[in-house]
Regions:
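Conserved ABC ATPase signature
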Residues: 131-135, 139-141
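Conserved ABC ATPase "signature" region
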Residues: 68-73, 112-128, 178-179
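Helix N-cap at the start of a conserved alpha-helix in ABC-type nucleotide-binding domains
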Residues: 167-169
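Catalytic Walker B motif of ABC-type/P-loop ATPase nucleotide-binding domains
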Residues: 156-160
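A short, proline-enriched helix->beta-strand linker immediately N-terminal to the Walker B motif
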Residues: 150-154
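ABC ATPase NBD coupling module
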Residues: 70-88
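Conserved H-loop
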Residues: 185-191
Length: 239
C-alpha cells in the first residue's frame, strides 16, 4: 500500500493464538495516517501493537512496511524490534528510572542535542532534570512520548497515550502529533479504550472483539450511547 507521501505504509495480516481466542486481523496504515484500535478489554489490541513492534511473534501472516517485510511466516523471516524503525509508547511507559527525563529522551536521539525541543513541545521542559519517580503519571506519559519520537520512527505505536492526561494536555498532544505527521509522514496506530474518542474521531477506527475486526461492536456502543442520551430524566427532560 502506498500513501500520499510516495512511500509504502503498513500492511499486515496477523494471526496469533491467545488463551481464549485467535487474533486474526488485517491492518493497513498509510504514511501520515492515524488508525485507532478500540474494543472491549482483552480483545487483542495490545497484542496487535506488540506484534507490529516485533515484541510478539505472530503464528502466521506477514507485516510489510516501507517496501520491506518485517515478518513473513511462510519464509521464517522476522526482523527484530531494533531494526524496524518504530516508536512504541507502552502502558508501562518504558522510561529508565535512573535517568532524568532529558537523559531518557537523549538516549533515544539519533543525533546529539534536541532533547529540550521535544520536551518543550509537550509542555514538560521545566521537568528535564527530574527522574521519572519525581513527576506525575501524566508527565511520565508525555516524557515517554518524547522518547518514542526522538528516534524519528516511521511508525508510531501508542497504547492508551492519553490515559493519564487531562483535557488540556490531551489536546496539546493531539496537535503536536498532527504537526509531526504533517512534517514527516509518520504513520500512527493507536489503542484507545475511550469510547467517546473512538466514536467522535475523524480518523479511521477499527473495533476488535475476540481478536476479530468487529464493526458491529462499535455501532452497538454508538447506539447504546445515543439511547442513554435520549433517556428521560426524572424531571421529564432528556440527558
Amino acid at each position: 500500500m502506498t500513501g500520499g507521501h510516495g512511500r509504502e505504509g503498513l500492511a499486515a495480516h496477523l494471526v496469533k493464538r491467545l488463551a481464549f481466542f485467535t487474533l486474526d486481523l488485517h491492518l493497513e496504515c498509510a504514511p501520515g495516517e492515524t488508525v485507532l484500535l478500540t474494543g472491549p478489554s482483552g480483545s487483542g489490541k495490545t497484542t496487535t501493537l506488540r506484534c507490529l513492534a516485533g515484541l510478539d511473534r505472530p503464528d502466521s501472516g506477514f507485516i510489510h512496511f516501507g517496501g520491506e517485510y518485517w515478518h513473513k511466516s511462510e519464509t521464517g523471516l522476522h526482523i527484530g524490534p531494533r531494526h524496524r524503525g518504530i516508536g512504541f509508547l507502552a502502558q508501562e511507559y518504558g522510561l529508565f528510572p535512573h535517568m532524568t527525563v532529558e537523559e531518557n529522551v537523549r538516549f533515544a536521539l539519533k543525533e546529539p542535542g534536541g532533547a529540550a525541543a521535544y520536551l518543550d513541545s509537550v509542555g514538560i521542559a521545566h521537568l528535564r532534570r527530574r527522574k521519572p519517580h519525581e513527576i506525575s503519571g501524566g508527565e511520565r506519559q508525555r516524557a515517554a512520548l518524547c522518547q518514542s519520537l526522538a528516534s524519528k520512527p516511521r511508525l508510531l505505536l501508542l497504547d492508551e497515550p492519553f490515559s493519564a492526561l487531562d483535557i488540556e494536555n490531551r489536546q496539546l498532544i493531539r496537535e503536536y502529533l498532527a504537526a509531526v505527521q504533517k512534517a514527516s509522514g509518520l504513520a500512527i496506530v493507536q489503542v484507545t479504550h475511550d469510547l467517546t474518542e473512538a466514536l467522535t474521531s475523524a480518523v479511521r477506527v477499527i473495533a476488535l472483539d475476540k481478536g476479530q475486526a468487529a464493526p458491529d461492536w462499535l455501532e452497538r456502543q454508538r447506539a447504546a450511547l445515543m439511547q442513554g442520551l435520549a433517556a428521560p430524566r426524572r424531571d421529564g427532560s432528556v440527558a
